[in-house]
Amino acid sequence: MSKEKVLLAYSGGLDTSCILKWLLEQDYEVICFMADVGQTEDFAAAREKALKIGAADVVVKDMKDFFVEKFVWPAVQMGLIYEDRYLLGTSLARPCISKGLMDVAVQRGCSYISHGATGKGNDQIRFELSCYALSPTIRVIAPWRMETFCQRFQGRSDLLEYAKRSNIPVSATTKAPWSMDANIMHISYESGILEDPSVAAPEELYQLTQSPTRAPDTPTVAEIVFKAGLPVRVTELVSGRTMERPVDILAFLNKAGGEHGVGRIDIVENRYIGLKSRGVYETPGVTVLHCAHRDLEIYCLDREVLRVKKYLADRMADYVYNGYWYAPEAEYVRKCILESQKHVSGKVVVEMFKGHVMVTSRESMHSLYNQELASMEVHGNFSPYSSTGFIEINAVRLREHHRVFGTANMTKHFSRTESDMKLI
């Protein structure tokens, strides 16, 4: 009787290597899957390690272009920022990796998938919801949520002992006092010493960006061209170097922004499962793109459309963070936001300098900015006398509020009691 097949999302690290061995002990045939989304990984060494442990095969899939074009670029186009700060680098990678994982699972006839995500994190949710949306009949083995596995492996020391007994190669390098997840879009850091929010992240943690205090004294200036909200070309203005391929654009902006310390954030965020967590993120290139895209949006879109679009983008950011990239509500909101991007085309010049990115100019054939109307030098077609009636109409409710609540309300507003001062 043939063994049931499991496709394991494999990283080559201690956790998934031990899970691979443990699955083999449970009498499964295990195929390992690795997605190359731009992380610094020795895939050849990881493949050799998995085969040595006992994997039936190792599939390594280059997904960098797919990730940037189908996930990162749409996220910029939609303006997705979770809780107004996190640019979703890890969250976007999970549905991308899940797509590759499920494609291989179907091709290789796997009844199960397995992963090494912990039971407290967001990744377990993102992976599994994405996989169920793509293949409803797939079954999931999540060892870190299984009582027998968790009782056997209480932590890293138990895994190391198991690896030693099972002849699983373990890296001799000292483990960093934090965990890291990297891809072509960003690097995230959490856990370890970062679990104390009062402790500042050490400078040696950062790998994509250097401290703004050590940044060059000359700014890097680039022109970014957008078409329907998507970046299509970037030109470094000093050298004239031009990039059009999405991964090349992102690589250039990561390097240029990183040299100036652009895109560092240290935040506490709300996980979907209800916990708060502290994360440190480096996202230089996409930080630059978001800045340029937002500026062009304001230049080209109606004010009320912008407000509705911002509301929808916030909802979509929640969907992505929580693992619902492939959900019907996300698909619906995506289509609504894309309607707003039809005229977000033009070019934006940005200046990256010592931790900051600033837009210095913008041009678009679809701009709603009317220089003659906006000018303080000429009246143009705008009658300043019309403002009198506008002010009068908008003052009606304020006058009525004062008529009813009047002096007593104002006295309370401007008074300060001793207890009030203690709160300030």
UniProtKB/Swiss-Prot annotation:
Keywords: Amino-acid biosynthesis, Arginine biosynthesis, ATP-binding, Ligase, Nucleotide-binding, Urea cycle. GO terms for molecular function: argininosuccinate synthase activity; ATP binding. It catalyses: L-citrulline + L-aspartate + ATP = 2-(N(omega)-L-arginino)succinate + AMP + diphosphate + H(+). GO terms for cellular component: cytoplasm. It holds the Pfam family Arginosuc_syn_C. InterPro entries: Arginosuc_syn_C, Arginosuc_syn_N, Arginosuc_synth, Arginosuc_synth_CS, Arginosuc_synth_type_1_subfam, AS_cat/multimer_dom_body, Rossmann-like_a/b/a_fold. Its EC number is 6.3.4.5. GO terms for biological process: argininosuccinate metabolic process; L-arginine biosynthetic process; urea cycle. ATP binds at residues 9-17, 35, 114-122. L-citrulline binds at residues 86, 91, 122, 126, 179, 188, 269, 281. Homotetramer. Belongs to the argininosuccinate synthase family. This is Argininosuccinate synthase.
